[in-house]
């Protein structure tokens, strides 16, 4: 699932535009909000990416540096709500942008980040309910007055968890991947809560807080994810009121599961100086902070000042609660971090009773020995000392070992990865999980065999041993009688230890040839800050071959662990009624464990921050001091967080997993937490902070005793982001660890003094060896210096010889250049003489041409006169031709007129003849009738009539044909005459165009080549004329040869 990463003005110069920028004005009838028109010291406009999941948050204009925020004047209006339906709202981005505002998302498809609480102390942390009442959603490090809470809407249904059929089963995480978790349903009104999941399939992730510092921190709202915060209620329509804030100001603020469940988010809102802490209680240290599961148990997320003995939790059972935070011991402390800037954030406190604590998030595993889930958070209700696992990210595993017989919880499906996913692009790697064959009753929080369970890289955790052999990395819950997660002083078998070291060696062996080059090891140790590289190489490569074999590597690690040359082990005197802490064994085993941890993570081709040896060695700082004497400057305030001097931590942050160990104050039953922190790509140091050195005394802690501390080494520093990352991800430190007085230093036993003496003897021998080596090196350098002096003298002699040769060569080159110059001058003089002779010749030719010029001019004048005469003749002939053409035109017009007249006469004659013929026929018919009357034969008369009619018709036809023949002859004669006339005119035009120009003018204006071309054109024209005349004659001979007859 991808989470939208917010960006701020620290990354961009201009604020977002369009729908992503907050617009001043009222959004709803009850929603006045304090918008910031210009950037203030503690309020800036924030810019988010343009994607569909981009968050929207409006900054607050803060006039005073420590003012919580200028919210709306009406107490019932929610503040800092997102207005875009497709935008995600970050409640608090507190790691990267110190001044960015915090709010809740409105879009079901966008992630909402609960709180980024370490880097940005000045940004508001949620939606305050009253202008002067700060409400703390999470624990802040530097600014206790920052408001944190959720606005309450009386009509918003909130399904935090689904109540199960069995009353004793934990009520938190769903066992079905499709279970719906609706922490809050968004409504159209601007006063509706903008935080919880909207979609039916949306997973609910509590908070991804510290590992990926740049990723959003809240409840992602994308569907189809496998990890849900809680199962949907059996009655999805049952309303869950966070708080009826608009109607009842004193209504409890929480997430009840049923209408009769009293769930209080904050007890008092009216008192301006009483902040509502979501994760802490001020009055009663034993109060529970958890989430509600049943109606019989009251759920008080933060009940302040009025009911100190009330259980502040959302209970799972009447006697089961999840501690969201540990409360300070002083009741007047208003904030967890107020006045304690250097204290780590203790996210979870467990009650003193062994059976009182049940984590709010997990769900009981139906099979106690089920090993499929890679992590778990809480124990079973039936088991007194179950283990807890808090998996926050694909590469973050927080193990809460609380008993040897560890059970697994939070099992959704056999293959469902139980972690809070984060926006990461890294490949999925398998969890390395180891099984301890020696302790069959001890169950680790990891499966028994290596399996690709989830995209996390787990660490091989050793089985838990006795209470005296604990490695207290971080104080566990005080009430859990289970022992802390410990590393055994000796591996189970030599084969297992060899397997772990083999994994480390294979990670360092880049070439795969079975050897690790000493240069690669030194480079690795130098890059990761190891200060005793020489001592390490002496142990790992005693023969000085330049390569490290696995046998040397194994023996060196065993020697470092057994002899402990670099750790500078010191023992502490046990306090009264306590046993002496078994320090050396646990510390030695921790070296082995560290090597195995580095195998899984640090050497997998990624950049790491600290080497495996840097954590345990420091040549300069090895004195046991009081924790109070530790300088206060050894904390980093760049991200608004700090580490108290009592907490000396060491942290490995490789690519896929790391070990974070923080010793805290002890408990009757000491607990330890090993934080496996991944995502090395998000490591970025903001500012310089001093780190604390991890000593064996720090790593070992007896049953119910406080550890001893060392002065922090300035060479080994944990950045504020590492500290911040621990503060939110450990989730196990308690406020009592900060409020209790620092542990008193104890005296070291005689055995530790003997170890110190042995160590000092070793150091003296090493220094003697170094001195001898320095003397040898000095003599060698003197010898080399003498050789270099001799060589310098020889080079000086050689230089002098080279200079002499260079001078001779320069003289020779100068002589050659002079000879070449003389030769070039002679050649140039000869060329000048030749050019002068050529110039004289050209002058003579020019004089000759000038003498011919008058003759040529006379010829030109003569030719021009001839040309003029020819032009006059041509003009005269042209005039005559025009006159003839005019006469011809007139005659043609007259002829056409006469022809037209003749045609009309002819037609009139034809009509007259036709009339006469008709009259004749009529008369003949009358004659025949008369003859019939006279008695003549009709047949003879009819024949005679027919013969005469036929004769008359033939005569008319003959006359018509004769007339047509005469017309055709006349037309032929006319056409022939026209052809001849046109031929003559064409010939004249050709001759006139050919002789239109004077020959002298043409000769004077054209060159020889052009003249020859003109002659060729003239010959071509003559040829064409001859051909044209021949064709005319042939046409005349064919049509009318009589025209050519001589009369």
Swiss-Prot record:
Protein name, entry field: Rab11 family-interacting protein 3
Sequence segments annotated as region (ARF-binding domain (ABD)): 775-879
Membrane topology: Peripheral membrane protein
Gene name for this UniProt entry: Rab11fip3
Described function: Downstream effector molecule for Rab11 GTPase which is involved in endocytic trafficking, cytokinesis and intracellular ciliogenesis by participating in membrane delivery. Recruited by Rab11 to endosomes where it links Rab11 to dynein motor complex. The functional Rab11-RAB11FIP3-dynein complex regulates the movement of peripheral sorting endosomes (SE) along microtubule tracks toward the microtubule organizing center/centrosome, generating the endocytic recycling compartment (ERC) during interphase of cell cycle.
PANTHER family in alphabetical order: RAB11 FAMILY-INTERACTING PROTEIN 3 (PTHR15726:SF6), RAB11-FAMILY INTERACTING PROTEIN (PTHR15726)
Comment, domains: The RBD-FIP domain mediates the interaction with Rab11 (RAB11A or RAB11B).
InterPro entries named in the record: EF-hand-dom_pair, EF_hand_dom, FIP-RBD_C_sf, Rab-bd_FIP-RBD, Rab11-interacting_regulator
CDD domains: EFh
One GO CC term, this protein: midbody
Residues given in the record as Ca(2+) 1 binding sites: 509, 511, 513, 520
Localization, UniProt: Recycling endosome membrane; Cytoplasm, Cytoskeleton, Microtubule organizing center, Centrosome; Cleavage furrow; Midbody
UniProt-listed GO biological process terms: cell division; early endosome to recycling endosome transport; endocytic recycling; Golgi to plasma membrane protein transport; negative regulation of adiponectin secretion; positive regulation of cilium assembly; positive regulation of mitotic cytokinetic process; protein localization to cilium
Segments forming domain FIP-RBD: 985-1047
Cystine crosslinks: none
Ranges annotated as biased composition (Basic and acidic residues): 64-73
Transmembrane helix keyword on record: no
Presence of the UniProt keyword ATP-binding in the record: no
């Amino acid at each position: 699932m991808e989470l939208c990463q917010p960006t701020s003005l620290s990354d961009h110069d201009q604020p977002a535009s369009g729908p992503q920028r907050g617009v001043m004005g009222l959004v709803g009838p009850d929603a006045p909000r304090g918008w910031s028109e210009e950037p203030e010291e503690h309020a800036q406009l924030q810019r988010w990416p343009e994607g569909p999941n981009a968050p929207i948050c409006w900054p607050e204009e803060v006039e005073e540096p420590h003012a919580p925020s200028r919210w709306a004047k009406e107490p019932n209006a929610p503040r800092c709500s997102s207005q875009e339906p497709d935008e995600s709202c970050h409640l608090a981005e507190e790691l990267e942008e110190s001044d960015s505002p915090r709010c809740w998302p409105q879009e079901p498809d966008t992630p909402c980040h609960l709180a980024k609480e370490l880097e940005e102390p000045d940004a508001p942390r949620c939606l305050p309910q009253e202008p002067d009442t700060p409400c703390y959603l999470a624990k802040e490090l530097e600014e206790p007055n920052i408001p944190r809470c959720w606005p309450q809407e009386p009509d918003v249904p909130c399904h935090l968890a689904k109540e199960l059929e069995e009353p004793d089963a934990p009520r938190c995480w769903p066992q079905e991947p499709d279970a719906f978790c609706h922490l809050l349903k968004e409504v159209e009104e601007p006063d509706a809560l903008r935080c919880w999941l909207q979609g039916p399939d949306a997973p609910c992730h509590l908070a991804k807080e510290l590992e990926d510092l740049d990723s959003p921190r809240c409840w992602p709202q994308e569907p189809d994810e496998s990890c849900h915060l809680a199962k949907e209620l059996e009655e999805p329509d049952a309303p869950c009121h966070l708080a009826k804030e608009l109607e009842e100001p004193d209504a409890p603020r929480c997430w009840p599961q049923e209408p009769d469940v009293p769930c209080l988010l904050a007890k008092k809102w009216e008192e301006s100086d009483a902040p509502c802490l979501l994760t802490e209680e001020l009055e009663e240290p034993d109060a529970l902070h958890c989430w509600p599961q049943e109606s019989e148990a009251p759920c008080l997320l933060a009940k302040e000042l009025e009911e100190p003995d009330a259980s502040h939790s959302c209970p799972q059972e009447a006697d089961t609660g999840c501690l969201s935070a540990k409360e300070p011991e002083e009741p007047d402390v208003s904030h967890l971090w107020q006045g304690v800037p250097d204290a780590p954030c203790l996210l979870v406190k467990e009650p003193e009773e062994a059976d009182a604590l049940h984590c709010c998030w997990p769900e009981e595993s139906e099979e106690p020995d089920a090993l499929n889930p890679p992590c778990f958070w809480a124990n079973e209700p039936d088991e007194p000392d179950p283990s807890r696992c808090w998996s926050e990210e694909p590469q973050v595993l927080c193990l809460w070992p609380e008993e040897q017989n560890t059970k697994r919880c939070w099992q959704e499906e056999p293959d469902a990865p139980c972690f809070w996913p984060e926006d990461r692009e890294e490949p999925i790697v398998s969890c390395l999980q180891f099984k301890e064959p020696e302790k069959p009753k001890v169950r680790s929080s990891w499966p028994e065999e290596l399996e690709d369970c989830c995209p996390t890289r787990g660490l091989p955790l050793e089985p838990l041993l006795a209470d005296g052999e604990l490695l207290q990395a971080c104080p566990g819950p005080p009430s859990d009688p289970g022992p802390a997660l410990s590393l055994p002083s000796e591996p189970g078998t030599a084969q297992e230890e060899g397997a772990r070291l083999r994994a480390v060696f294979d990670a360092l062996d880049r070439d795969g040839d079975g050897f690790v080059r000493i240069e690669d090891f030194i480079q690795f140790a130098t890059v990761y800050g190891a200060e005793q590289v020489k001592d390490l190489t002496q142990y790992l490569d005693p023969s000085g071959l330049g390569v490290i074999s696995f046998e040397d590597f194994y023996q060196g690690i065993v020697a470092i662990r057994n002899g402990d040359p670099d750790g500078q082990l010191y023992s502490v005197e046990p306090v009264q009624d306590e046993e002496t802490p078994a320090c050396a064994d646990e510390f030695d085993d921790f070296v082995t464990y560290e090597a195995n941890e580095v195998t899984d993570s640090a050497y997998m081709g990624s950049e790491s921050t600290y080497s495996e040896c840097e954590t345990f060695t420091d040549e300069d700082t090895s004195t046991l001091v009081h924790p109070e004497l530790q300088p206060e400057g050894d904390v980093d305030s760049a991200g608004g967080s700090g580490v108290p001097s009592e907490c000396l931590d060491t942290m490995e942050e490789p690519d896929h997993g790391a070990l974070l160990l923080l010793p805290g104050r002890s408990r009757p039953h000491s607990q330890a937490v090993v934080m496996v922190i991944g995502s090395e790509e998000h490591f970025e140091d903001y500012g310089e902070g001093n780190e604390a050195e991890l000593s064996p005394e720090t790593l070992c802690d007896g049953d119910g005793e406080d550890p001893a501390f060392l002065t922090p080494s300035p060479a080994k520093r944990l950045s504020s982001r590492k500290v911040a990352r621990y503060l939110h991800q450990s989730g196990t430190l308690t406020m009592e660890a900060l409020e209790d007085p620092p542990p008193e230093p104890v005296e070291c036993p005689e055995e530790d003094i003997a170890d110190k003496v042995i160590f000092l003897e070793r150091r003296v021998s090493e220094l003697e060896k170094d001195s001898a080596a320095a003397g040898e090196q000095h003599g060698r350098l003197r010898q080399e210096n003498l050789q270099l002096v001799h060589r310098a003298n020889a080079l000086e002699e050689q230089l002098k010889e080279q200079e002499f040769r260079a001078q001779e060569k320069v003289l020779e080159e100068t002589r050659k250049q002079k000879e070449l110059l003389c030769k070039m001058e002679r050649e140039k003089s000869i060329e000048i003489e030749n050019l002068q002779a050529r110039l004289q010749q050209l002058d003579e030719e020019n004089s000759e041409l000038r003498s011919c010029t008058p003759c040529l001019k006379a010829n030109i004048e003569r030719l021009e006169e001839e040309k003029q005469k020819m032009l006059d003749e041509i003009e005269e002939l042209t005039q005559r031709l025009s006159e003839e053409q005019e006469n011809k035109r007139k005659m043609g017009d007259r002829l056409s007129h006469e022809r037209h007249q003749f045609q009309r006469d002819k037609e009139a004659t034809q009509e007259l003849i036709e009339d006469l013929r008709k009259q004749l026929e009529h008369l003949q018919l009358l004659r025949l009738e008369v003859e019939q009357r006279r008695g003549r034969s009709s047949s003879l008369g009819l024949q005679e009539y027919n013969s005469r009619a036929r004769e008359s018709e033939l005569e008319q036809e003959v006359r018509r044909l004769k007339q047509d023949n005469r017309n055709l002859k006349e037309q032929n004669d006319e056409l022939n005459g026209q052809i001849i006339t046109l031929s003559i005119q064409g010939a004249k035009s050709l001759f006139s165009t050919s002789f239109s120009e004077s020959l002298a003018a043409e000769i004077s204006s054209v060159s020889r080549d052009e003249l020859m071309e003109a002659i060729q054109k003239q010959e071509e024209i003559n040829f064409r004329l001859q051909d044209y005349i021949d064709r005319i004659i042939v046409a005349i001979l064919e049509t009318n040869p009589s025209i050519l007859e001589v009369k």
